[in-house]
Structures are given as structure tokens and as C-alpha cells.
Amino acid sequence: ISEDTSSDKVSTYIVRSESKDKLQTLYRLLCTFESGQTIVFCNHRESVDRVGEYLRSQKLAHEAYHGGMDQEVRERALYKFRNGSSNILVSTDLAARGLDIPEVQHIIHYHLPGSEDAYIHRTGRTARWNAEGSSYLILHAEEHTPEYLEAEIEDYVLPERAGRPQPPMWSTLYIGRGKKDKINKVDIAGFLYKKGGLTRDDVGTIDVHDYYAYVAVRRDKVRQLLILIGNEKIKGMKTKIEVAK
């Protein structure tokens, strides 16, 4: 295997699935992660959608990401993943390169990557900037470890029972005003502090676009915040403020 994927910072495991349908195995694996951001890689858009639907049925917060989605939907998914509103991103190899996604601790290969190059780019999403990370290959009985993974890989044995992952600390709010309305990050932060009663620790990253903005707010503060700012104006303008879908 190339030195790009043999870094001591990445621990690689095989997770055995009793059936070709790996959804339950994936869910059990995700439930063993106490913290950290996770990317689940699938080989097809349809698989991303199917995995996403299953996780939704299990009420597991996640975002889906693939080339068949509108650009705005993809941008929102990445923003929510980056700001900690979602700890799980289910994606095709579109997320394997060229995206600024820091601090990913877990990579799950729901499907085996089609090539060594694809594996390298997927695994390269974790253990960046001197952090440590883990890579998991979910294999059913008829699948074998790829030849380019020469070293013997440890099996990751799933517990019979595991708790559910903690919900994300943050929630993303949509604000229906942006740069074209002369709204900037300072305006949004000030509005949330003054009208919403939030502190600096309650507000995460703010992303302002031309006609709208996103802001991360501590999840346990959102309900009261929306009540407080329901009829308030930002810089004298009425605007829609809601939890981003």
C-alpha cells in the first residue's frame, strides 16, 4: 500500500456484516462512536439516498451529499457537517477530495472503493493536521480485503448492545437575509446576543451568502431563541429565521 494510506495516524479495521445488506451493521458501528465526525462512503448516489433514509428512520442525525443534488442542498449539507450540526456525512466519492472538511475522525467504507486511488483519497479525509483517525471497511461474507491493503487488518467486533450516539451539540439556523441586504457576520452575532439572549459560547460558525445566511447555535438554546426573536427585525428588516432543513 502506498505511504499515503499507511500512516501510523490511521487505524484500519474490518467490520463483518452477516448479510449483503449492511444497513444494520452500519448503524451498530455508528452507535459505537462516542464522539467525532464520520464520513460514510458509498459507491452510488442511490446508495447514499438509501442509507440516508435508513438513518433517518433510526432518528440518527446525518447529512447526505452527492452530485445528483442541487448545489444549494450540497452546500447546506457540508455547512451543517462542518459546523457540528451533524456528525455524520453519507456521500459518494465526491466528498473524497477537494473539499475543506477538517477534523474527520472516522471513515466508513460502506462499499469497497473501486480502486486504490479512491481508497487513498477517502482515507485521506481523516488524520489530518497531526490528528488521529480510523478507517472501517464493512465486508459481507463474499467480499474480500482489497489486494492493495497488504498488511493484516484487525477485525472490529461490534458489541451486542451499544447506546445511541450523542446528538450534535449544534443546530443550524437559516436567516433569510445576506450580503445583498448589507448583512454581515457581526450583524448576525450582535442580533443573536442582543435580541436572543445568547452568549458568545452559544454561537458557532456564521456563513453569509448573497441572499441568506446560516448560523450554528447550541442545540439546547434554539427553541427559546426562536421564541425571543420571532417578531424582531435585523437591521430594521423583517426576515425568516428557522431551523435549516
Tell me what each language-model feature is:
Residues 1-73, 110, 138-151:
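Interdomain coupling/hinge region of P-loop NTPase helicase/AAA+ cores
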Residues 55-56, 81, 192:
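Hydrophobic alpha-helical packing residues
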Residues 88, 97-112, 134-138:
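A short beta-strand element within the Helicase C-terminal
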Residues 158-245:
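Non-catalytic terminal extensions of ATP-dependent helicases
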